[in-house]
Every structure is written in structure tokens, then in C-alpha cells.
Swiss-Prot record:
This is Bis(5'-nucleosyl)-tetraphosphatase, symmetrical. Hydrolyzes diadenosine 5',5'''-P1,P4-tetraphosphate to yield ADP. GO terms for molecular function: bis(5'-nucleosyl)-tetraphosphatase (symmetrical) activity. CDD domains: MPP_ApaH. Its EC number is 3.6.1.41. Gene3D superfamilies: 3.60.21.10. Belongs to the Ap4A hydrolase family. InterPro entries: ApaH, Calcineurin-like_PHP_ApaH, Metallo-depent_PP-like. It catalyses: P(1),P(4)-bis(5'-adenosyl) tetraphosphate + H2O = 2 ADP + 2 H(+). It comes from the Bacteria.
Length: 271
């Protein structure tokens, strides 16, 4: 049995299938862990959802910001973004089944054997593992309740930007969602910055640092594997591995076999 982690697919199914073929992935005994954002700008978002769902227990996937946006669009809360290729999902005969399946996916998954925690964007530097897990399960329970549409209606804000155990209601849920699915940089005092999307090397300010480099970040018992931030181009350090390497932007898709620490890459196919 082998366990593979792969960065954001964003509808780039062909590249994923090539990687799985290269490593001779066997759904009967291997596992594929996906860092979220199954859908968005790639050409096969619908097919990607169908494929990952078809893997059953052989796949572990989590919710990314594009996945949550897809759910919001399905409820008329937001519109399909101009460059997204997700419209076919809403007219597919299995649309409701796929969207319900997606809504049942977690924000955080733990691989106990290898002491790895996987989220889409990372873990708030103000959380330890116990808090991160509790916060993920808290929002996941709302997504599975009759309040899920209300939650998605109110997630599109950048505040609150700092964690406080006294946060409650939609403010609390919004911080949790932003930390797990949108976070990149933090201010030196731990506040989340939701505006800057530059590569870290292009930042001129001393006030912003990647969330995983914050000096007073709480220590975690597990290594964090995440996607979301293509500009990191596969950063491996600070007890984190960033697996989004910009396939949807014409770069490549990265897969990591945790059993032996080997990486596999697939160049983006020209569309």
C-alpha cells in the first residue's frame, strides 16, 4: 500500500491521470490524498469531481476555497467566476449528487501513521493541533446542517483577521474558513492578511510573512501538507510541504509519495 498526496487539481484531470498511471496507482490498495480545489479554471472540473468521488475510500480530499465557492454558486449566492470552467457541473444529470458529496468533505484530514495533517491553505499560526481539529469539525458540522446555506452566504469577508476563543457565530466560522482555505500571509502579530498573493520573495514589507514562517507560530505535532499557494512552487521546510505548483497556470502538478518521500511531477498539458 502506498499513500500519495497531490496538489490542487482545479479541473486538470488529464495531468492527474498521467501521474496516477506513472506511479501505477492501485485503487484497491493505495490511497490518494488531495489538497482541495478539485474544481475551477481547468477544463475538466465536472470530470474531476466524478473521478475523485468514484475512488471511494481510496481518496481523501478536503475543501478548498474554490470548492466552497462552487457550493455557493449552486445556491445562487455567488456567480461563476469569469475564468472558471465549472458551469457544466450545474447542468450535469448527477449535479446534485456531486455537490452533496463535495459538501460532505472535511476541511482537515489527519494521517495518523505518518503524523501528517492536510488542509487546503494551512493552519492558523494561532492554533495548535487540537484547536485546528476542533475548529475544522465545528464548521464541517454546520456544512452538514440546515444552516449550511446561511454559512456560505456570510463567508465572503476578510474579517475577523485574528483568532480569539471568544469568537462566536458567523465571525468564528468565517475566521476558520479563511484560515483553512484562503490564508497565505500573516502580519507579525499573527493577524491574517487576505489581500497579498505575491510570492514571498517579492514582498518588500517587513510586516508580512508566510503563515508557516511566523516566529511566534504555535508548534504543531504534525507536518502540514497543503495546496492553495502556487507561488510557493513546492516549498518543503518549516515542517510543511506545499504541493500546489501551478498546473492550472501552465506549470506542473506535483505528487508526493509519503512512504519513501519521493516526488513526481507532470507538466501542464497545453489547452
Amino acid at each position: 500500500m502506498a499513500t500519495y498526496f497531490v496538489g490542487d487539481i482545479q479541473g486538470c484531470l488529464d495531468e492527474l491521470l498521467l501521474l496516477l498511471e506513472r506511479v501505477e496507482f492501485n485503487r484497491e490498495k493505495d490511497q490518494l490524498w488531495l489538497t482541495g480545489d478539485l474544481v475551477a479554471r481547468g477544463p475538466k472540473s465536472l470530470e474531476t469531481l466524478r473521478f475523485v468521488k468514484s475512488l471511494g475510500n481510496a481518496a481523501v480530499t478536503i475543501l478548498g476555497n474554490h470548492d466552497l465557492h462552487l457550493l455557493a454558486v449552486s445556491q445562487g449566492i455567488s456567480r461563476v467566476k469569469e475564468k472558471d470552467k465549472t458551469a457544466p457541473i450545474f447542468t450535469a444529470p448527477d449535479s446534485e449528487e456531486l455537490l452533496t458529496w463535495l459538501r460532505h468533505q472535511p476541511l482537515l484530514a489527519v494521517h495518523s501513521e505518518y503524523d501528517i495533517v492536510m488542509t487546503h491553505a494551512g493552519i492558523s499560526p494561532q492554533w495548535n493541533m487540537a484547536t485546528a481539529i476542533d475548529c475544522a469539525r465545528e464548521v464541517e458540522s454546520v456544512l452538514l446542517s440546515d444552516k449550511w446555506v446561511l454559512l456560505l452566504e456570510n463567508m465572503y469577508e476578510n474579517y475577523p483577521d485574528t483568532w480569539d476563543v471568544t469568537l462566536s457565530g458567523i465571525d468564528r466560522y468565517r475566521y476558520i474558513i479563511n484560515a483553512f482555505t484562503r490564508m497565505r500571509f500573516c502580519h507579525l502579530d499573527g493577524r491574517l492578511d487576505m489581500e497579498c498573493k505575491l510570492p514571498p520573495q517579492d514582498i518588500n514589507s517587513d510586516e508580512l510573512v508566510p503563515w508557516f514562517e511566523l516566529e511566534n507560530r504555535l508548534p504543531l505535532s504534525h507536518k502540514v501538507i497543503f495546496g492553495h499557494w502556487a507561488a510557493l512552487m513546492g516549498h518543503d521546510g518549516n515542517n510543511v510541504i506545499a504541493l500546489d505548483t501551478g498546473c492550472v497556470w501552465g506549470e506542473y502538478m506535483t505528487m508526493y509519495r509519503v512512504d519513501d518521500g519521493k516526488y513526481f511531477t507532470q507538466k501542464a498539458i497545453e489547452q
